[in-house]
Amino acid sequence: MAASIIDGKVIAADLRARVAGEVTRIKRDHGLTPGLAVVLVGNDPASEVYVRNKHKQTQAAGMASFEHMLPADVAQADVLALIAELNADPAVHGILVQLPLPKGLDTEAIIAAIDPAKDVDGLHPHNAGRLAGGLSALSPCTPLGCIILTKSVHASLEGLDAIVIGRSNLVGRPLVQLLLNENATVTIAHSRSRNLPELCRRADLVYAAVGRAEMVRGDWLKPGATVIDVGITRVPAAEGKTRLIGDVAFDEAMQVAGAVTPVPGGVGQMTVACLLVNTLRAACAIEGLSAPGV
């Protein structure tokens, strides 16, 4: 029996609708409009698409959207000055610097300059440290989306065996912490791990975030496992076109797993939706309101 497909589009749309409902409520009850500022340095086409999408979805949720476009040759000091302004702006509750940054800019210093209370990407060392300590924190959006997708299949993750393939600061490491917070039993692996197929076959939950196209094969999977594919690779297709595939061999996984996220249409849909969640949570925390019900 083929696995079920975890539809990220549907789950993300539901999450965005719930965020919009909470925004409407806090506007009505408290006169507060959450605001998200996005900083884009340079003119990378993919980054421009992401920023436009974030702007559109932020406004659709009823939030204020602020875009700051800087040239690729901007000085580090000018980026830091802009972040200082946004930190001090009461209309801005969330700050996101679109990554990657052009060469010559110190990404770590720029991320560290963001007020941790407004760090809706969850990358500031303060938030990363709190997450690692099992404390409440703004969490990176993609791992947060992975947890929500998993919970669409499993009401509780407690006691489940999970493997995270990938150890990046953006996805792998924070995802491990979020899974631990859910009382899952977690193995963290990567492209150089020994006996990786064997490790995967033990797991109820498989998270592939290593950036290697179709690395995880169907015979790596435990029958009935839930598979969350974070990877995204563009490969040639017919008629000179390209298509997107993930880190998991999707057709093979569908014959073994219990549930699988597609690429596209899976994890990617959740990232911006979770950015809206983080912005809403940040706004409520900054303004001293109770945590939103999303």
UniProtKB/Swiss-Prot annotation:
Catalytic function, reaction form: (6R)-5,10-methylene-5,6,7,8-tetrahydrofolate + NADP(+) = (6R)-5,10-methenyltetrahydrofolate + NADPH; (6R)-5,10-methenyltetrahydrofolate + H2O = (6R)-10-formyltetrahydrofolate + H(+)
Keyword NADP applies: yes
GO biological process per UniProt: L-histidine biosynthetic process; methionine biosynthetic process; purine nucleotide biosynthetic process; tetrahydrofolate interconversion
Keywords recorded for this protein, A-Z: Amino-acid biosynthesis, Histidine biosynthesis, Hydrolase, Methionine biosynthesis, Multifunctional enzyme, NADP, One-carbon metabolism, Oxidoreductase, Purine biosynthesis
GO-annotated molecular function: methenyltetrahydrofolate cyclohydrolase activity; methylenetetrahydrofolate dehydrogenase (NADP+) activity
Residue numbers binding NADP(+): G166, R167, S168, S191, I232
Pathway in which this enzyme or protein is active: One-carbon metabolism; tetrahydrofolate interconversion
Domain of life: Bacteria
Family: Belongs to the tetrahydrofolate dehydrogenase/cyclohydrolase family.
Primary role: Catalyzes the oxidation of 5,10-methylenetetrahydrofolate to 5,10-methenyltetrahydrofolate and then the hydrolysis of 5,10-methenyltetrahydrofolate to 10-formyltetrahydrofolate.
Record HAMAP family: THF_DHG_CYH
PANTHER family the record matches: C-1-TETRAHYDROFOLATE SYNTHASE, CYTOPLASMIC, C-1-TETRAHYDROFOLATE SYNTHASE, CYTOPLASMIC-RELATED
Protein name per its UniProtKB record: Bifunctional protein FolD
Organism field: Nitrobacter winogradskyi (strain ATCC 25391 / DSM 10237 / CIP 104748 / NCIMB 11846 / Nb-255)
Taxonomic lineage of the native organism: Bacteria, Pseudomonadati, Pseudomonadota, Alphaproteobacteria, Hyphomicrobiales
